[in-house]
Design a protein with these regions (language model features):
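Alpha-helical protein-protein interaction modules
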Residues: 1-12, 16-151
Length: 151
């Protein structure tokens, strides 16, 4: 995270640097700061073709802050920009489940499973999704389990 902060300090007008920092902070649980950097990225480059990544950091930040409805708002926007974006699909599924919309999450999981390469498993999530604390990883995995991901 130090290197990404350094990039933001060296080039504060870089939307990409703010976006990378936003996602790093979000995965570490620094939600409010992550949102600030995600918003900065969107402000600096409002027509950027990577807008889904900018919004992704904000969606993750809301999820880690347990603001699941806000996370859903951002994942829905991300999926409208990039329907096949696997990270947004997984987060959308976990956010639906954690917000209590378990039936919707279960239905959406079938879409996620159909499109996910390699096949989506809890083991794959633990190995590849970079939540930085056990608590945050468990929050995410719990959402996917509620949606019906069982192994």
């Amino acid at each position: 995270m130090t290197a990404i902060r350094g990039a933001v300090n060296l080039t504060p007008s870089s939307a990409a640097a703010h976006s990378h920092l936003s996602r790093g902070l979000a995965f570490a649980g620094y939600s409010d700061e992550a949102i600030q950097h995600g918003e900065a990225a969107m402000r600096l480059s409002p027509l950027d073709p990577e807008m889904a990544l900018f919004r992704g950091g904000i969606a993750i930040a809301h999820f880690t802050a347990r603001r699941f409805d806000e996370s859903l708002r951002f994942t829905e926007e991300n999926l409208s920009l990039r329907p096949g974006f696997q990270g947004a699909q997984r987060l959308h599924c976990a956010s639906l489940a954690q917000s209590g919309r378990v039936e919707e999450a279960r239905a959406f999981l079938s879409t996620v499973r159909r499109n996910h390469r390699p096949p989506l498993t809890i083991a794959w999530v633990r190995e590849n999704v970079p939540y930085q604390t056990p608590e945050l990883m468990e929050l995410y995995v719990e959402g996917l389990r509620k949606a019906g991901l069982d192994k």
